[in-house]
A protein has these predicted regions:
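Conformationally flexible catalytic loops at phosphate/diphosphate-handling active centers
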Residues: 208-293
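Peripheral docking tails and interdomain loops at the edges
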Residues: 357-402
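Structural signature of the thiamine diphosphate
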Residues: 182-239, 352, 392-402
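Glycine-/acidic-rich phosphate or pyrophosphate-binding loops and their flanking alpha/beta elements
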Residues: 50-55, 278-301, 314
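Short hydrophobic alpha-helical segments enriched in small aliphatic residues
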Residues: 3-7, 16-19, 26, 30, ...
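Thiamine diphosphate
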Residues: 79-173, 185-205
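Redox- and metal-dependent alpha/beta enzyme cores, enriched for Fe-S-associated oxidoreductases
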Residues: 291-325, 330, 336-342
Length: 402
């Protein structure tokens, strides 16, 4: 069951976008959008494929009208740039694909392309995304949209090439300097790897804020059936000028320059810019929370998990219920904004919450803040690239809440 915060009713995962005013840093911009939905085409129009999560994301980028990809190879996300190179979208849609000299170069190319109103993206894995944090902070400060894909691996440092979820803090707390956030979507299937590309760009341009797809080595490398989105043409220059009046497009007839920058030397103006940024974040928190619940109708306990850990949690629930333990699942889809009100509501009549992560305990801090001591919260996780087994989670449930 998908639920959105606009209706508080079960729904398909879709948000309709209308003309909405979003505060810029020095002026109010009117962002123009048409209604967008996920997977609304019929089966006859859909193209079903069997592929890896990384491959599905690359195909979705081509089909969603992305203008450019700039990236650097790193396991376990290299299939993204490999697939784009194999598909040669520059010959069909005109999409630019560049293997940059580094992750630092990649994110700054995204900064430049996004500042021109283009739909541009990059992808990397944990240590590579760490190198991108300066550029992401600059994009957030300048109000530049763009997509960053993080297919997580174990750390710290160079770590391992095995899957992990240890980038949670880096993604949800604004990994660079300054008071900022990025929208973070956590897929738990190959289908969502494809679906979240268009959704990420929609939200990123709606609010002029970077968006991140926080995946991991399990989701990136696993193969599943996926319904690819229909082909959508890239926007014309005229459409970009109309939809992105803030963008630096070099258009003729403009007497006042459009400057894309995060720099402001006057503190009183910088404070105003920051206050407007915080107001934008409040709007996002109010309107863009997404999550999924399962087996919660009669649940006495709840597992909170995201990404691949949520897939494992579903099997855990099956095993636990076979033993008479009534447990349900709460899966945050947006890690930022985090569904804290929804978790608090779901926890009202519970005996305990187990937060399952492939890390030492990160999301559990947000869950504890959400329930505010009303119910016991325990954590179970594995480290170093080890993926937890469902039987281990069942054992943790019994030990923590016996």
């Amino acid at each position: 069951m998908f639920t959105d915060t606009n209706t508080q009713k079960p729904s398909t995962p879709t948000h309709a976008l209308d003309v909405r005013r979003v505060e810029s840093y020095v002026q109010t911009d009117v962002l123009l959008f048409t209604e967008k939905k996920w997977r609304t085409n019929t089966m006859a129009e859909q193209e079903v494929k069997l592929m890896k999560g990384n491959e599905a994301l690359a195909h979705a980028a081509i089909r969603c009208g992305v203008d450019g990809y700039f990236g650097y190879p790193i396991t376990p996300q290299t299939e993204i740039i490999e697939t784009l190179a194999e598909e040669k979208p520059w010959e069909t849609t005109g999409m630019v694909v560049v293997q940059a000299e580094s992750e630092v170069a990649s994110i700054n190319m995204v900064y430049g392309g996004g500042g021109c109103g283009k739909k541009v993206m990059t992808s990397s894995s944990s240590p590579g995304v760490a190198l991108m944090q300066e550029g992401i902070s600059y994009m957030a400060g300048a109000g530049v949209p763009g997509l960053i894909v993080d297919v997580q691996r174990g750390g710290p440092g160079l770590g391992t090439i095995q899957p992990s979820q240890s980038d949670y803090f880096q993604a949800t707390r604004g990994g660079g300097n300054g008071d900022y956030y990025v929208i973070v979507l956590a897929p738990n299937s190959v289908q969502e790897m494809a679906d979240f590309v268009d959704l990420s760009f929609t939200l990123s341009f709606k609010y002029r804020i970077p968006a991140m797809i926080l995946s991991d080595g399990v989701i990136g490398q696993m193969m599943e059936k996926v319904v690819l989105p229909p082909m959508k043409p890239r926007r014309t220059e005229e459409e970009i000028i109309k939809e992105c009046p803030w963008a630096s497009t070099g258009r003729v007839g403009m007497r006042d320059p459009l400057v894309i920058t995060s720099l402001e030397l006057k503190p009183e103006i910088m404070e105003v810019r920051n206050l407007r940024l915080q107001e934008k974040y409040r709007q996002i928190k109010a309107n863009e929370v997404r999550y999924e619940t399962k087996f919660m109708e009669d649940a006495e306990y709840m597992i909170v998990a995201f990404g691949s850990a949520a897939r494992i949690a579903e099997k855990t629930i099956e095993l636990a219920r076979a033993e008479g333990i009534k447990v349900g699942l709460f899966r945050p889809i947006t890690l930022w904004p985090f569904p804290e009100k929804e978790i608090k509501e779901a926890a009202k009549n519970l005996k305990g919450i187990l937060v399952a992560e492939i890390n030492a305990g990160m999301m559990i801090e947000d869950v504890r803040l959400a329930v505010d001591g009303a119910v016991k919260c325990a954590h179970y996780g594995r480290l170093g690239g080890i993926v937890p087994e469902p039987e281990e989670m069942v054992k943790a449930l019994k030990e923590e809440f016996k």
